[in-house]
Structure formats: C-alpha cells, structure tokens
From Swiss-Prot:
tRNA processing in keyword set: no
Family listed: Belongs to the glyceraldehyde-3-phosphate dehydrogenase family.
Pfam family, one: Gp_dh_C
Organism of provenance: Hyperthermus butylicus (strain DSM 5456 / JCM 9403 / PLM1-5)
Entry binding sites for D-glyceraldehyde 3-phosphate: 140-142, 195-196
PROSITE patterns: GAPDH
Alphabetical UniProt keywords: Cytoplasm, Glycolysis, NAD, NADP, Oxidoreductase
Record's protein name: Glyceraldehyde-3-phosphate dehydrogenase
First-listed, main subcellular location of the protein, grouped into a coarse class: cytoplasm
InterPro entries tied to this protein: DapB_N, GlycerAld/Erythrose_P_DH, GlycerAld_3-P_DH_AS, GlycerAld_3-P_DH_cat, GlycerAld_3-P_DH_NAD(P)-bd, Glyceraldehyde-3-P_DH_2_arc, NAD(P)-bd_dom_sf
SUPFAM superfamilies, per database record: Glyceraldehyde-3-phosphate dehydrogenase-like, C-terminal domain, NAD(P)-binding Rossmann-fold domains
SMART domains noted in UniProt: Gp_dh_N (SM00846)
Length: 343
C-alpha cells in the first residue's frame, strides 16, 4: 500500500497526539515533527524515534541541549506530501506561505480563522466535499463535538435550529498561565459565542446560537444542547441514533459516570494514553424528547476529540479513502475508538 508522507508542524497538545495517531495508520508515514524549543517534549519525540525538525536559527540551541535535529522546517517540507499545522492559534497563517511554496497539502486547526483553508472540515458532516482539496481546517474541539451530534441527529430528520450553552474548561492540564481560578466567566458576554459561527462554516444554513462560560476545571468541556427538528421523533430514535454513530459514546450515569472527573477516571482505567477520550460523550439520562424538540448534555475532551478528524482530513486531501465510512473504519480501528454505550 502506498503511504502518504506527513509532517506535523508543532508538537504540543494537539500535535503530539496527531503525530502518534499518524504512526498507527497503515496508509501514512510520519516523516517528522517540528519544535521551536529544546524542551522535554522534543526529547520525548526523539525517544519515540520521531525525527525533529527545527528553525535554522535554533540548530545550535538544540544541539547544546543534546538534541540532534533531523534538519530544518524547510527541509521537512521538501520530504512530505501533507503538513498538519498544529502551531498555536493564529500562527498557521504565518507558515502558510512556506507551505504553499513547498507545494504541500495543508491541514490547519480550529484556532485559525476559517478563510485560511478551502474548507472547514468535520468527518461526519462533509468528508466527501473535502476530497482532493489543497487545504482543510479541522474545526475546534467544541465545534467538533457539536457537529458530531448535530450531523448524527440529522440522520433522523433535518435540524431546524440549535441552541447550545458551552461550559468551557479554563485551561488544559499542563497550562499554568490561564484561568480563571476562582470565577465563572462569560466567554464572551455577548451572544452568540464564536462556536455558532464556527459550526456555520461547515453547516452554513443551520440556525444556531451558542453562549459560553469558562469554569475553573481542566478536564473537559460540557455542552447543554437544544435542537428542534423538522419532524417529531421519539427518545428511542435519538438514543438509537447516537448509539450507532461512530465516535459517540452514551454514558450511563447510574454506573458512576455522572461527571467529567468520572469519565476521565474511566479513560484511565481503560489504559488510555494521557486519559484521552477522542469520542464525544453524551449522557444517556440527559436525552429528552418532546415532539420535534430534542435536548441532551455532552462532554468534550478538548485535548483529544479533534485527533480522528485530523487523520481523516489527511486521507481526504490525499484521496486515500473515498467515503466517510471508509476513513472512519480505518481511523477508529487503528486508534481503538469505541461507539455505543459505556461502561
């Protein structure tokens, strides 16, 4: 099987997860990753046998720390077919001219503005539209969670409108410069929050409004979602739809899975690396239906949920899989993703 050659620019929260996911795929080769600082994650990459590429001006700094770079970022781009930009939000735009000069396909993250790429991407919603594109933007963690649920529900009936409240984590576990520590902060105070606008980059005709607050936790986001459909459905219909959708798990609170802390502990007990939960978690008991109205609560692990979509985005631009079903089957099998109910 011919394998697409992939590089990852950035080896932080998303980059390291995407890089390791690429290494598990049968049709992809991880050529290398980039680092700008010779820190512990650079040493970790080397320990995993991952070639590390650095800015030209940083070669000696890395060598002084005992890290021998495989080359420069420009040299990495000469060796790859696809580059996944996992740099901090807004930085991808600075790198884009470099990618274009190298003639590589580009995958950006949701921290970039939508106009950076030809298409904003979510596997369950628009995989086929992404085939053969030069550039894609994988939408943010919260948007990925919303879109998985919305595009799943839309299999039952067209979705007329969505109203959602996003309860955001304040920081990732490793972050020390973010907050709040002792407050609940509207983010933003004005309505809508940016999440609705981001959903509309994939589903432009959807009537959606979101509001968001940030709370002092690091584990996961929580969404409280109200959707109105074009025709009445039953609760059994909704449960069955979520249960049969890839990358969605129904959590039964009666088994002690009634909080994000317990979900994370369950992931630890499963032996998940970094307690990653790439699946969207929908609380089974929260699902309520009243005719055309559907309500539920869901949890999003912000560090991991976009990883499968990044892998699918690589397949889309490289045209390695022609359908969403095909790429989901390969990605989810290789990453050990679950669907159905837990525990």
């Amino acid at each position: 099987m011919a394998r697409v050659r992939v590089g990852v620019n950035g080896f932080g929260t998303i980059g390291k997860r995407v890089a390791e996911a690429i290494m598990l795929q049968p049709d992809m080769e991880l050529v290398g990753v980039t680092k700008t600082k010779p820190d512990y994650t650079a040493k970790y990459a080397v320990s995993r046998g991952i070639p590390v590429y650095v800015p030209k001006e940083s070669l000696e700094e890395f060598q002084a720390k005992g890290i021998e770079p495989a080359g420069t970022i420009e040299e990495l781009l000469e060796k790859v077919d696809v580059i996944v930009d996992a740099t901090p939000g807004g930085t991808g735009r600075k790198y884009k001219p470099l990618y274009e000069k190298a003639g590589v396909k580009m995958i950006f993250q949701g921290g970039e503005k939508a106009d950076i790429a030809e298409l904003s991407f979510s596997t369950l919603c628009n995989y086929e539209q992404a085939l053969g594109k030069t550039s894609l933007r994988v939408v943010s963690c919260n948007t990925t969670g919303l879109l998985r649920a919305i595009c799943s529900i839309s299999r039952l009936a067209p979705v007329r409108r969505v109203r959602a409240t996003i309860v955001r984590r304040a920081a990732d576990p490793k972050e020390i410069k973010r907050g709040p520590v002792n407050a609940i902060k509207p983010d933003p105070v004005k309505t809508p929050s940016h999440h609705a606008l981001d959903v509309k980059t994939v589903l432009p005709d959807l009537d959606i409004v979101t509001m968001a607050v940030v709370v002092p936790t690091t584990l996961m986001h929580v969404h409280i979602v109200y959707a109105e459909l074009e025709k009445p459905v039953t609760r059994e219909d909704v449960v069955a739809t979520f249960e049969s959708t890839p990358r969605i798990l129904l959590a039964d609170a009666s088994y002690g899975l009634a909080s994000t802390a317990e979900l994370v502990e369950y992931a630890r007990d499963l032996g998940r690396k970094r307690y990653d939960i790439p699946e969207l978690i929908v609380w089974l008991d929260s699902i309520a239906v009243n005719g055309v109205e559907v309500m539920w609560m869901q949890a999003v692990h912000q560090e991991a949920i976009v990883v499968p979509e990044n892998i699918d985005a690589i397949r889309a631009v490289a045209e390695l899989a022609k359908t969403a079903e095909e790429t989901i089957r390969i990605t989810d099998e290789r990453l050990g993703l679950l669907k159905g109910r837990i525990p």
